[in-house]
């Protein structure tokens, strides 16, 4: 009985740890965006704010930059450096930030 309870508690905590790790990974990846978009994604003057943007919308934009379908200056080069999973993490981080 005790072992079952301990196992249940440990297994219940696993998603929380994974979620925290993803959030930290997203924040770490998003740090490279800070120069133009700010550390919190609110955007430096003249740059689009990313904070609070829908995750799917941001993923589409980054994919468009990466493929060259969306016009940009430096975002083509920057976005090509990220995997699909990293783009998901970055988009998740910025979508969770307050506008």
Model features per residue range: what roles?
Residues 40-70, 76-80:
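Gly/Gly-Pro-rich "capping" loops immediately C-terminal to redox-active cysteine motifs
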Residues 20-21, 39, 78, 93-95:
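Residue-level hotspots at or immediately adjacent to binding/recognition sites across diverse folds
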Residues 33-39, 90:
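The canonical Cys-X-X-Cys-His
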